[in-house]
Structures are given as structure tokens and as C-alpha cells.
Amino acid sequence: MNRWLAAGGILLGALVVFSFVSAGAWGGADGVAGDTITTINPSYEPWFQSLWTPPSGEIESLLFSIQAAVGGIIIGYYLGRDRPRGQSQDMGSDLP
């Protein structure tokens, strides 16, 4: 019962916090950087253009999610692989 109550409280808290954020606050860093550069130097021209633009926002989100998943797998593998090795070295030091 306490677990469900805690999960419900966390979910309710997240909903309250996110309900106060306007849609404009979710803009990306690229858009903010582009606006700042244009403000500083209106005659600025980019050095290069994208080689490929995803056909839709959903594809772009999918690629970002895959990138995050691969990064998480790599970090998880490293942490999972590194910890047992450190524990086995500690266990061997107690032997006479």
C-alpha cells in the first residue's frame, strides 16, 4: 500500500510541476542558439547545412531515443562489468 501511495504522490507531483510549464519553455538548445547568434550578428551565415533531415518529427524522436538507449546500454555494460571485477579483488585480499 505504501509503495502505491508513494508512486501516486510522485506522479501527482510531476503532473503539478509540468502543468505550470508553457509550451515555449520546451524549445531546444539549437533554436535558442540560433536566435542568440542572429541577435549578436544578423549577417551571420552558417558554415554548412545538414546532410540529411529526418522526414518527420516522429522519426527524429525515434533516432534520439535509439541514441539514448545505446548510450544507456554502454554505460550499463561498463558499470555491470566493472563492479564484479572490483569485488573479486577485494575478496581475494582476505585470504591468507
UniProtKB/Swiss-Prot annotation:
Its biological purpose: Part of the energy-coupling factor (ECF) transporter complex CbiMNOQ involved in cobalt import.
Family annotation (InterPro entries): CbiN
Pathway(s) this gene product operates in, as recorded in its UniProt entry: Cofactor biosynthesis; adenosylcobalamin biosynthesis
Subcellular location(s) per record: Cell membrane
GO BP: cobalamin biosynthetic process
Family, similarity comment: Belongs to the CbiN family.
Subunit structure: Forms an energy-coupling factor (ECF) transporter complex composed of an ATP-binding protein (A component, CbiO), a transmembrane protein (T component, CbiQ) and 2 possible substrate-capture proteins (S components, CbiM and CbiN) of unknown stoichimetry.
Main subcellular location: membrane
Transmembrane segments: 4-24, 59-79
Keywords: Cell membrane, Cobalamin biosynthesis, Cobalt, Cobalt transport, Ion transport, Membrane, Transmembrane, Transmembrane helix, Transport
Stated name of the protein: Cobalt transport protein CbiN
GO molecular function, one term: cobalt ion transmembrane transporter activity
Cellular component terms per the entry's GO annotation: plasma membrane
Superkingdom in the source lineage: Archaea
Membrane topology, as annotated: Multi-pass membrane protein
One Pfam match: CbiN
